[in-house]
Amino acid sequence: MTRRPLLVSSLAACFTCAVAVLGAGFSAHANAADICVKVEVQNVRAQQGQLMVAAFGDAASFGKKPMSQMRVPAGEATTTFELCGLSGDTVALTMYQDLDSDGQMGRNLLGMPSEPWGSSGKPGAFGPSWDTAKVALDGSPIVVYLTQ
């Protein structure tokens, strides 16, 4: 069995989530709203582009098929919005700030994100996984910190 280095595996997981956000057809509220939650995004580059947000309901769909997704204009350094269309008792959010509003996450020559990105929960240094990004839908706001 061949083992991939941890860095490569972790980056692949991060980019898988980014692809899910990028590949999703964005709309204000893609699914019927069952549960709504307040989302607070910190470290936003104020007034630049938009936040591309995807919400996943379980490990099987994480990075593949979001249950809800939306675009949010980048406001202040801390941007707050309501995300609806959620169900269940757990959710994981992934997002990036599309600085140039081209609908795609910018990448450098190594394929690393060149635009700010983040996830809910306690993301690892090399990108989120379901286990690190999942948070309870208990009425508390979800806080996401964007990595520059």
Give residue ranges: language-model regions.
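C-terminal segment of classical bacterial N-terminal signal peptides
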Residues: T16-H29
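A short, amphipathic beta-strand motif
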Residues: I35-N43, V53
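Beta-strand signatures of extracellular beta-sandwich domains
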Residues: M52-F56, A92-T94
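Short proline/glycine- and polar residue-rich coil/turn motifs
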Residues: R71-A77, A136-D138
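Exposed aromatic-hydrophobic patches
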Residues: T78-L86
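A short, solvent-exposed beta-strand micro-motif common in secreted/extracellular proteins
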Residues: D89-L99
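Acidic, glycine-anchored loop motifs typical of Ca2+
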Residues: L99-G106
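Extracellular beta-sheet/turn segments enriched in Thr/Pro/Gly and aliphatic residues
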Residues: E115-Q148
